[in-house]
Regions:
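Hydrophobic anchor at the start of a short beta-strand
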Residues: 63
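Exported/periplasmic ABC-transporter solute-binding proteins
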Residues: 25-58, 66, 71, 75-81, ...
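Bacterial N-terminal signal peptides
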Residues: 11-21
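Bacterial N-terminal signal peptides that target proteins for export
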Residues: 2-13
């Protein structure tokens, strides 16, 4: 008996599918890029993003940057034990991470310094004295010492001046980080804040804020230090990142964003 046309058609279809699919079985999947995780305080996100882009090209890798308050980032590192690099806004967090055995190596990449800030042009004529922070004529906002580096640094400054409790009683609110402090000024939610000087250099902020420097008697330059996390999956790339960030080229990137040559 001659096979029916439908049977012949089915056999041809099966053969066709076989020849189409079979070559695909031998194709190798592209190798997945190495992926690094960097914990970065918000004030340093711009230079770190720029340096990360350079390292990605040089080492054909992918770098993820998670940003936030330095204290909150350290808590996340301690809890999750994943990641490659940590750059907080103050060296005190690096010291804490070293004491907890979370970091194996460090490099110095820049400086941070706190300053008082008001709306552009200082329309309310706020004095550059720290005592302005206890003046109830002004809406004052500061960072929370428990969540971010600027909050911790603000507390140190005001404790040294002996007015921290008085300032806390006068503030409208405490924010988690430097980005929120800038937002408060720009959105007319504050007359006066204490923030990292570098934030006044950001393109999105510089037309909205005026800096009132704090005397070096109370506010000194703070070293910015990158730490290599002990559980880094790709320490050779992480170390290359650190080396570049600490080089003249890397420091020039930090300086561009107000994080090196700080007066």
């Amino acid at each position: 008996m001659r096979p029916r046309c439908s049977d012949m058609f089915m056999k041809l279809c099966i053969l066709l599918v076989f020849f189409i699919v079979l070559p695909g079985c031998n194709e190798e999947r592209p190798e997945r890029k190495k992926e690094l995780l960097v914990y970065c305080g918000i004030t340093m996100i711009k230079p770190m993003t720029e340096i990360a882009a350079f390292i990605e090209q040089e080492y054909d890798c992918r770098i993820l940057i998670t940003k936030g308050g330095s204290g909150n980032l350290l808590k996340s590192i301690k809890a999750n034990k994943v990641g490659d690099l940590y750059l907080p806004g103050s060296g005190s967090y690096i010291q804490s991470a070293l004491e907890q055995g979370l970091i194996t190596d460090t490099v110095h990449v820049g400086f941070n310094k706190a300053a008082m800030m008001v709306k552009k042009g200082n329309p309310k004529g706020v004095s550059d004295s720290l005592d302005s922070l206890v003046d109830n004529r002004y809406f004052v906002v500061i960072g929370n010492p428990e969540s971010g580096s600027i909050g911790r640094e603000t507390k140190k400054i005001l404790d040294k001046k002996g007015i921290f409790s008085d300032v806390v009683n006068n503030v409208q609110t405490m924010t988690t980080d430097s980005k929120d402090l800038s937002r408060c000024l720009k959105n007319d939610e504050a007359d006066l804040v204490v923030n990292w000087y570098a934030t006044s250099m950001w393109p999105e902020n510089k037309d909205y804020v005026t800096v009132l420097p704090i005397s070096s008697e109370y506010a000194g330059k703070k070293k910015l230090i990158i730490g290599l996390l002990r559980f880094s999956r790709y320490p050779e790339i992480a170390e290359a990142f650190m080396k570049y960030a600490a080089s003249d080229k890397g420091r020039a990137v930090f300086d561009k964003y107000g994080l090196y040559d700080v007066k």
